């Protein structure tokens, strides 16, 4: 075997994520000295069925690092980094649990990403080229979370994210520039109405003004868009993360109690009032039928499952059978390996489900999800506001890809 591709060793590092929590970085090195790194992100709002992180009782990842330096390094020694599926299958076998709890989804995804990057570098290819080959032709539309609520903020909004979607632009660079302008206009509006103190940023770079009602937040965002003349080019979205305001048999939102049926009517009202192109996790994570009913009522809105599917084909199959959503979030650390992530995206696309490659609220500067979105031809990428380095690293990577390789912007010819 060529020493350029043969794994010599793995090394684990305990690093810091954007929420001041400890996470793991893995370094893979071949005998020829080719090196690749992978970081594990972490969510604040987590699906009950996603891969379990391996963390120490005090929140650190010393045990995970030790596992990489010993068991994983020994087990993967001499493997060919180009054999991603074989390596990921080995990780899954070594773990031996359904929820990745022995090795940890965090340990596994950091290792899996590091293997991918090492192989790509050894071949002299860009990551997106290695992932997608000649299929990689488009830059995804960004979903920018510019106003935060829920578990991502310190205000009283129950809806977790208020999103802008720049669609009708010729280039990604134009789309991101318009989004920056809307973001800054929103900051000005918040300053005027509530004071500069409320322009502090949430976990994902969005603002967290002292709002309590969903419509107040949507009004602020829509006013920012319209004041710049972008109402025909920039659309809106929400991540409700509704499991967080579901209580036994009802939802508590905007100071009211809603049944699932009443909440469907409320979302329909919002979609009639605002250009809502996207709604994520509008119901609690086991309610496939309410997702389906909402999607059937909102023909021009991409109802999307995150906690509903947790990047797991078995859960997505249920959603497809019930026609629960037009879209699915893709978070590699929810499932634990690059191979399983690619299989999930392939399954979604074969069943006409749109894919949204997504960050987590606890991120690092690793920009691999940008390459993953391009390489898999995902329609969307969701990676926060156009601020904070762990968010902008992904946008800056997409700018590089567009300018260096001339790829087209997905929004230019995208139709619902």
Curated annotation (Swiss-Prot):
Its cofactor is Mg(2+). Disulfide bonds: none annotated. The keyword Lyase applies. Keywords: Cytoplasm, Glycolysis, Lyase, Magnesium, Metal-binding, Secreted. The active site is at 204 (proton donor), 331 (proton acceptor). GO terms for biological process: glycolytic process. This is Enolase. It comes from Sulfolobus acidocaldarius (strain ATCC 33909 / DSM 639 / JCM 8929 / NBRC 15157 / NCIMB 11770). The gene is eno.
């Amino acid at each position: 075997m060529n020493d350029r591709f043969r794994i010599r060793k793995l090394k684990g590092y305990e690093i810091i994520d954007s929420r001041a929590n400890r996470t793991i970085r893995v370094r893979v090195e071949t005998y020829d000295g080719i090196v690749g790194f992978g970081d594990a992100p972490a969510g604040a709002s987590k699906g009950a069925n996603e891969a379990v992180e391996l963390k120490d009782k005090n929140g650190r990842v010393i045990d995970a690092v030790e596992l990489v330096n010993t068991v994983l390094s020994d087990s993967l020694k001499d493997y060919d980094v180009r054999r991603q599926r074989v390596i990921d299958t080995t990780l899954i076998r070594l773990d031996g649990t359904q929820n990745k709890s022995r090795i940890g989804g965090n340990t596994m995804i950091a290792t899996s990403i590091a293997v991918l990057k090492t192989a790509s570098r050894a071949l002299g290819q860009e990551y997106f080229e290695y992932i997608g080959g000649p299929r990689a032709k488009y830059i995804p539309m960004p979903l920018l979370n510019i106003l935060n609520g829920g578990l991502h903020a310190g205000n009283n909004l129950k809806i977790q994210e208020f999103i802008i979607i720049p669609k009708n632009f010729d280039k990604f660079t134009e789309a991101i520039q318009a989004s920056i302008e809307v973001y800054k206009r929103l900051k000005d509006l918040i300053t005027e109405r509530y004071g500069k103190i409320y322009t502090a940023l949430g976990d994902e770079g969005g603002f967290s003004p002292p709002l309590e009602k969903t419509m107040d937040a949507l009004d602020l965002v829509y006013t920012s868009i319209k004041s710049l003349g972008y109402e025909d080019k920039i659309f809106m979205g929400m991540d409700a993360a509704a499991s967080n305001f579901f209580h036994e048999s009802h939802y508590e939102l905007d100071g009211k109690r809603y049944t699932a049926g009443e909440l469907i009517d409320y979302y329909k009202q919002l979609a009639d009032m605002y250009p809502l192109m996207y709604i994520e996790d509008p119901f609690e994570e086991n309610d496939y039928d309410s997702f389906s009913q909402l999607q059937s009522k909102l023909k021009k809105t991409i109802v999307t499952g995150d906690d509903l599917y947790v990047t797991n084909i078995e859960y997505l199959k249920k959603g497809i059978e019930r026609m629960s959503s037009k879209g699915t979030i893709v978070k590699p650390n929810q499932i634990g390996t690059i191979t399983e992530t690619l299989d999930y995206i392939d399954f979604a696309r074969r069943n006409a489900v749109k894919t949204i490659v997504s960050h987590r609220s606890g991120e690092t500067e690793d920009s691999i999800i940008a390459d993953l979105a391009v390489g898999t031809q995902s329609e969307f990428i969701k990676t926060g506001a156009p601020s904070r380095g762990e968010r902008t690293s992904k946008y800056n990577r997409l700018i590089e890809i567009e300018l260096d390789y001339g790829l087209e912007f997905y929004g230019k010819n995208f139709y619902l």
